[in-house]
């Protein structure tokens, strides 16, 4: 595996017990280190199965040609714990991840399991809570937090154990638009500051448009893998499998039809509005 790849799947299939049809069927892909990759597809397409395979929560169907490589480690029954140290998952419902009586206790849980000395543990907990803007809540009870605050704490708990890869498994789907945008901004900044690899499992097409790369799944196979501009410039491809294109991409396509070219660097609605205002002011 190239040093530039954080995750690589080679000829990976997976079939759940008591079912005949594989949920993943001979898939191959690579995810670049330090990048943000979004996995999109309808329910049952295999997105969450990929996240569990990447973390070693599941092992692929037995096949001599099948291989999963994570942070340079080939995943198997002997290396699964090494792989899990490299990958952290933030799930859809943060309540299912909380184990501590306070925010600080919860973030410290993974460090306690690794035998980190108390003074070092306190330093790490304070640092990661500061990273996600939750240090003021260190003594708060998780049950009293908002959904967005709970997800920030869940992210801090993952950051504390310093993984190479963070998987967001539908982790913004239960948040309101403001909470979702705040979480995505935090993740993007952490990715840059700490050179993390982010894998986003999402139904939210607008969230996927913010990624560096997009993998489109359909019925256990990879339909396409490319940058978001390329993927979302083919609306018919997504519509065939019941997906839409992001609102911003819809507007950009309409502008293109009228002869207005929008820079490829523009991904968000705010950036598009700012560009159009600048364009209008030049007239």
Swiss-Prot record:
Entry's localization field: Cell membrane
Enzyme class: translocase
SUPFAM superfamilies in the cross-refs: P-loop containing nucleoside triphosphate hydrolases
Topology within the bilayer: Peripheral membrane protein
GO terms, molecular function: ATP binding; ATP hydrolysis activity; ATPase-coupled transmembrane transporter activity
InterPro entries for the chain: AAA+_ATPase (IPR003593), ABC_transporter-like_ATP-bd (IPR003439), ABC_transporter-like_CS (IPR017871), ABC_transpr_CbiO/EcfA_su (IPR015856), ECF_ABC_transporter_ATP-bd (IPR050095), EcfA_1 (IPR030947), P-loop_NTPase (IPR027417)
Coiled coil: none
Keywords annotated in UniProt: ATP-binding, Cell membrane, Membrane, Nucleotide-binding, Translocase, Transport
EC number(s) from the headed UniProt entry: 7.-.-.-
UniProt cross-references to PROSITE patterns, sorted A to Z: ABC_TRANSPORTER_1, ABC_TRANSPORTER_2, CBIO
Major location category of this protein: membrane
Entry-linked Pfam families: ABC_tran (PF00005)
Entry similarity comment: Belongs to the ABC transporter superfamily. Energy-coupling factor EcfA family.
Subunit structure: Forms a stable energy-coupling factor (ECF) transporter complex composed of 2 membrane-embedded substrate-binding proteins (S component), 2 ATP-binding proteins (A component) and 2 transmembrane proteins (T component).
The protein's name in its UniProt record: Energy-coupling factor transporter ATP-binding protein EcfA1
Organism: Lactobacillus acidophilus (strain ATCC 700396 / NCK56 / N2 / NCFM)
Encoding gene per record: ecfA1
